[in-house]
């Protein structure tokens, strides 16, 4: 928890959300405070916060809660303070209480958004009308509807409509032409384009709707839109679970202009032009440090998952506050697509442009070089799955491996596994001791391996288990008389 409101402002600045002069943060919880961050052009405030003011039993004040900008959410982190062990325990308990409250509120918002999505989707028309976004992107309106001059894109989890994305004809002052229905739980939500059945053998996955339309047009194959790079992995996980034998091709965005984006950022925000470069040797490619006035800069470029990123920090003072802003600029499209492909045994392809261009995705390729060029680059016959190639198990191991695939489910983002026979959680290290390193490493590398989010482990004594969840209830204990 933050010990002062200045700590909260510095945490905001560290992720690029700058509180403007004249706006004082204040405890607003349970209501939200809002402001237009420095650099925003549109009039509607896009930055928000909800700050709780609390006191320890000794009377010391600390602040908890969350903040963000548009759909981005950050929890207020603990800051250094001379807390006693008792106070640290109190603060930890309060943090747990607020996390549980936050999760419940998010679920309530998601439920309301899902109901609203059904209502608006039923009101939206299917009649194709002229729309500047469609014309600008050279696409047909696959799978969408129209409502008040907006394209309405459905967002599903399995077969349930959980939200909507709205696309406007023109970008606003801040370059934004899309928004999600407020409260939508976007993680794992997708939009299908084309017919997908249990017999589907080939399916493409993309980030954005326009890219999805272009890929569907070029390949005449079903496409799934994940809406953003960070959502590729959870969406592909769902597809792989539903279609374990299908060939999945991730047609990724190549956000390749990281170095020029970093140079522009430093010039616009600090009026400095640091030397930033990259070569092809090694993971850490380039390191640069300099001090300009009261600005201290340390920045380096590094290569990860086949993409170059710019990292480091900038230290400076603003309105009497000492700011240490983290720099973390990556080729999110390439990085996230590569990770998802490796995790789930998918093929991976990025657009290649023949001329100097600002294009980054397959829609840009269609607009600039034509549908035929995109079709050629997207040919699935030329693509092989990423990740370690699994050798077929020997006959003596086959039964063991199939049993492990059926019995265990990996908990996403952890080293913990759900054992469906014992009805308990177990660490992967313990599994290796039980079944051997060879068998468990094979299981981890097999795209058929089951995986689930922790929140989808549910306790349902009545047996009414929500779709996509695992029931951890294994019956009431029987106590003899």
Question: Where are these predicted regions, by residue range?
Answer:
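Acidic carboxylate-rich catalytic motifs and surrounding loops in phosphoryl-/glycosyl-chemistry enzymes
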Residues: 22-28, 145-146, 347-358
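Short, hydrophobic/aromatic alpha-helical segments in well-folded domains
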Residues: 130, 211-212, 235, 361, ...
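Phosphate-handling DNA/RNA-contact segment within nucleic-acid enzymes
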Residues: 109-112, 150-244, 262, 271
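Short, basic/aromatic recognition patches
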Residues: 131-148
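TOPRIM fold recognition
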Residues: 1-6, 201, 217-402
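Non-catalytic accessory segments of DNA primases and related replication-initiation nucleases
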Residues: 1-132, 255-257, 262-267
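N-terminal nucleic-acid engagement/recognition segments and initiation subdomains in replication
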Residues: 2-3, 15, 384-481
């Amino acid at each position: 928890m933050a010990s002062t409101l200045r700590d909260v402002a510095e945490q905001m600045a560290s992720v690029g959300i700058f509180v403007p002069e004249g706006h004082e943060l204040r405890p607003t919880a349970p209501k939200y405070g809002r402001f237009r961050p420095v650099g925003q052009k549109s009039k509607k405030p896009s930055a928000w916060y909800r700050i709780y003011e609390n006191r320890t039993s000794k009377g010391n004040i600390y602040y908890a809660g969350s903040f963000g900008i548009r759909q981005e959410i950050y929890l207020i982190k603990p800051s250094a303070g001379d807390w006693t062990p008792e106070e640290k325990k109190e603060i930890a308990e309060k943090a747990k209480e607020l996390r549980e409250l936050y999760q419940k509120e998010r679920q309530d918002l998601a439920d309301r958004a899902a109901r609203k999505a059904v209502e608006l989707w039923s009101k939206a028309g299917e009649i194709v009308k002229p729309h500047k976004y469609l014309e600008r992107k050279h696409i047909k309106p696959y799978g969408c509807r129209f409502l008040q001059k907006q394209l309405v894109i459905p967002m599903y989890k399995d077969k349930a409509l959980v939200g909507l994305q709205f696309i406007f004809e023109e970008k606003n002052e801040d370059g934004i032409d899309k928004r999600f229905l407020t409260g939508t739980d976007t993680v794992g939500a997708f939009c299908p384009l084309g017919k997908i059945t249990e017999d589907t053998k080939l399916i493409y996955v993309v980030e954005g709707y326009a890219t999805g339309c272009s890929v569907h047009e070029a390949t005449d194959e079903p496409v799934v839109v994940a809406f953003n790079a960070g959502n590729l992995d959870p969406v592909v996980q769902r597809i792989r679970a539903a279609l374990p034998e299908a060939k999945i091709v991730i047609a990724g965005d190549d956000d390749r202009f990281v170095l020029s984006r970093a140079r522009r950022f430093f010039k616009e925000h600090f009026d400095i032009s640091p030397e930033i470069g990259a070569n092809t040797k090694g993971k850490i490619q380039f390191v640069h440090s300099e001090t300009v006035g009261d600005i201290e800069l340390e920045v380096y470029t590094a290569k990860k998952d086949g993409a170059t990123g710019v990292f480091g920090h900038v230290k400076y003072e603003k309105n009497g506050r000492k700011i240490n802003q983290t720099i973390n600029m990556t080729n999110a499209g390439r990085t996230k697509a590569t990770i998802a492909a490796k995790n789930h045994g998918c093929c991976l392809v990025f657009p290649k442009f023949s001329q100097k261009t600002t294009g980054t995705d397959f829609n840009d390729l269609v607009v600039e070089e034509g549908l035929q060029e995109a079709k050629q680059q997207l040919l699935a016959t030329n693509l092989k799955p990423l990740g370690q190639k699994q050798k077929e198990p020997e006959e003596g191991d086959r039964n063991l491996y199939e049993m492990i695939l059926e019995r265990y489910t990996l908990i996403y983002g952890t080293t913990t596994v759900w054992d469906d026979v014992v009805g308990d959680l177990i660490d992967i290290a313990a599994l290796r001791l039980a079944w051997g390193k060879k068998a468990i490493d094979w299981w981890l590398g097999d795209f058929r391996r089951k995986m689930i989010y922790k929140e989808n482990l549910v306790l349902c004594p009545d047996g009414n288990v929500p779709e996509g969840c695992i029931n951890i209830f294994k019956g009431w204990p029987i106590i003899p008389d």
